[in-house]
């Protein structure tokens, strides 16, 4: 699992916990790797770590399943993101991240104005759009790596990636079945303890 995937999952879990508890809360994973938050002396900075597992208020049966990750989709995603999925575990982690993100579709956002920017309440002064030092055409074209008849020449297109035949997609599905079985077993045991 690469570092950016881990960071995304920790941040995403944090946001869902904020929705669940209605206050800022920091999970055990965040406390382990975030020494600033763990050692914060600010009284307004409340840290809540539940002592017992808390069932998710999201009905997992309503969560949309991630798409089937075939070789064509994996190659397409690799081209778009410039991230290569070197093994089955990387594809499985991507599938889990998509499954986790699909939970957001179940969050009711009616009547909530979308946040466009964190700085929407701050003034943003702009200067007048007047050229200070106008440049000549020759000076502008000096920036081009290649010029044809006083025009910039765009670089060649990206070379397409080769499809990796190394990935065993049945292993990804096997990982998926195992993890879902563990989650269902955990949810059942937590439900039995709470009842």
UniProtKB/Swiss-Prot annotation:
- In Pfam terms, one family for this protein is GatC
* Membrane-spanning parts: none
Subcellular localization: Mitochondrion
Where mainly located? mitochondrion
Q: What is its EC number?
A: 6.3.5.-
Supply the alphabetized keyword list: ATP-binding, Ligase, Mitochondrion, Nucleotide-binding, Protein biosynthesis, Transit peptide
Q: What class of enzyme is it?
A: ligase
Q: Name one GO biological process term.
A: glutaminyl-tRNAGln biosynthesis via transamidation
Reaction(s) catalysed (UniProt annotation)? L-glutamyl-tRNA(Gln) + L-glutamine + ATP + H2O = L-glutaminyl-tRNA(Gln) + L-glutamate + ADP + phosphate + H(+)
GO cellular component terms, semicolon-separated: glutamyl-tRNA(Gln) amidotransferase complex; mitochondrion
Range of the transit peptide: 1-18
Q: Which domain of life is it from?
A: Eukaryota
Which molecular function terms from Gene Ontology are attached?
ATP binding; glutaminyl-tRNA synthase (glutamine-hydrolyzing) activity
Keyword Kinase, does the record have it?
A: no
Give the family per the record.
Belongs to the GatC family.
Described purpose of this protein according to its UniProt entry: Allows the formation of correctly charged Gln-tRNA(Gln) through the transamidation of misacylated Glu-tRNA(Gln) in the mitochondria. The reaction takes place in the presence of glutamine and ATP through an activated gamma-phospho-Glu-tRNA(Gln).
Q: Which NCBIfam families match?
A: gatC
Query: Subunit structure, briefly?
Result: Subunit of the heterotrimeric GatCAB amidotransferase (AdT) complex, composed of A, B and C subunits.
Q: What is this protein called?
A: Glutamyl-tRNA(Gln) amidotransferase subunit C, mitochondrial
- Which classification does the entry list for the species? Eukaryota, Metazoa, Ecdysozoa, Nematoda, Chromadorea
